């Protein structure tokens, strides 16, 4: 799926997404669910469900009766469906900015690591509020791309030193919607949600070696892979060598663990 008016993320390879970001979504989801305090519900919607990590975390509670995950990417939805035979889970293809559900249909709505890729994120949040009943929770999480995503800075800061195109990519990635301090709180307030609370959650991104760290850049999923894929063979070889130096930081190749911090917000529908 190419970028659209509703998403700047080129999604199409579910396995590639799992390698690039899904494995970290899996780590983030339980803590985000704890933050939402959603423990019981007849119906919950996971907006921009991707490959299903948040939906799977939500149904860990036996008091959650049904979770609908919705995503623009057919490939992601099919992958999510394949991950569980839990009858409480449903995954459908659809647009976060035009949710195909009536007003107040869900008890709660949540979105994880998605809104930063929605050009009109305010519209998506308004839709989340619309389909959530009065008194229900609307919650979201986005990466702190500039100050809290070490793996990203290792790559884009290195690339930006030697390539103006990478410098422009860095500027784009570090200025995505709803990734700066206070952005989510302001957005939730503008949407008319009440009792708005913002917090942070940090997980660890653990890599076995540099090859594990670099592998997503050689794939086909996400903005980093797209950038690397446009480079010449010599350009890719040069960039890989430079990023490897940054990863090794003077020590032998092997495991590295980087912090990854997400902003989280929740509010109530009046």
Where are these regions (language model features)?
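Class I SAM-dependent methyltransferase Rossmann-like catalytic core
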Residues: 11-22
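Conserved catalytic/acceptor-binding region of the Class I
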Residues: 122, 129, 133-208
């Amino acid at each position: 799926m190419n970028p659209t008016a509703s998403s700047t993320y080129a999604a199409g390879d579910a396995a590639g997404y799992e390698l690039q970001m899904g494995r970290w979504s899996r780590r983030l989801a339980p803590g985000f669910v704890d933050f939402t305090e959603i423990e019981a519900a007849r119906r919950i919607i996971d907006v921009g469900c991707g490959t299903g990590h948040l939906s799977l975390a939500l149904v860990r509670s036996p008091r959650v009766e049904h979770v609908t995950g919705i995503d623009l990417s057919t490939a992601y939805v099919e992958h999510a469906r394949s991950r569980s035979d839990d009858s409480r889970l449903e995954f459908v293809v659809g647009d976060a900015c035009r949710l195909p559900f009536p007003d107040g249909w869900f008890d709660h709505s949540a979105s994880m690591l998605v809104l930063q890729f929605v050009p009109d994120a305010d519209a998506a949040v308004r839709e989340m509020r619309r389909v959530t009943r009065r008194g229900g929770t609307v919650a979201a999480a986005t990466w702190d791309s500039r100050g809290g995503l070490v793996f990203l800075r290792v790559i884009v800061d290195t690339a930006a030193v030697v390539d103006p195109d990478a410098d422009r990519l860095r500027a784009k990635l570090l200025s995505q919607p709803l990734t700066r301090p206070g952005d989510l709180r302001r957005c939730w307030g503008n949407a008319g949600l009440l009792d708005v609370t913002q917090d942070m959650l940090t997980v660890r991104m653990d890599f076995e070696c540099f090859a594990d760290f670099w592998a997503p850049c050689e794939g086909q999923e996400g903005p980093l892979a797209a950038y690397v894929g446009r480079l010449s063979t010599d350009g890719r070889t040069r960039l890989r060598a430079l990023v490897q130096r940054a990863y090794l930081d003077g020590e032998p190749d092997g495991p590295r663990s980087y912090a990854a911090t997400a902003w989280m917000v929740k509010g109530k529908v009046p």
